[in-house]
A protein has these predicted regions:
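Short, well-ordered surface patches within globular domains
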Residues: 8-79
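A well-ordered secondary-structure block
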Residues: 68-162
Length: 162
């Protein structure tokens, strides 16, 4: 898996997941960063990630409830990562969620133009300052919410060997 072993092909059956991973790794190679390895066991965490943003199949727009949902889910995700043996940093994971409130949902949409795509790739590599240096493991799922496709991606550091 992403503990340094050779990378297996993406197990996801969605071609868009493979395309996103390929694009990310190309971007990372160009920047001299390590490539990401697909990690199947992280896919379930994408469910936790998307849950605050969706209610009954529609995007959530109630800002007041929203931030408390997100905090709860972030704690759950941190706990789940920790349980699975992944390191928790100050910037412990980079999810396909932008920085601002319900606008976060917009950053989950797969980028349609080149500028958006570059922003997504930069964000998924730890932001402008590449804050998380040793990102290694990637998982992603594609969801249709209110008739639009959203990409829920998670990037974390390498597992800590026991």
């Amino acid at each position: 898996g992403c503990g340094g072993a050779p990378s297996a092909p993406t197990p996801s059956n969605d071609i868009r997941v493979q395309q996103a991973l390929d694009a990310l790794n190309q971007f990372r190679r160009d920047k001299g960063l390590t490539e990401l390895v697909y990690e199947k066991e992280l896919e379930e965490l994408t469910d936790l990630l998307i849950s605050p943003f969706v209610k009954e199949g529609k995007p959530v727009v109630d800002r007041t409830k929203f931030s408390s949902y997100v905090d709860v889910k972030e704690d759950e995700i941190k706990q789940a990562l920790s349980n699975k043996g992944y390191p928790i940093y100050e910037t412990y994971f980079t999810a396909g969620l932008g920085p601002e409130g319900t606008d976060k949902l917009k950053t989950l949409k797969y980028p349609t133009d080149e500028v958006q795509k570059q922003n997504w790739l930069t964000y998924m590599s730890g932001g402008i300052n590449m804050a998380v240096k040793n990102l290694r493991c990637f998982a992603m799922s594609v969801r249709s919410i209110g008739g639009e496709d959203y990409f829920i991606a998670l990037v974390v550091g390498e597992k800590v060997p026991h």
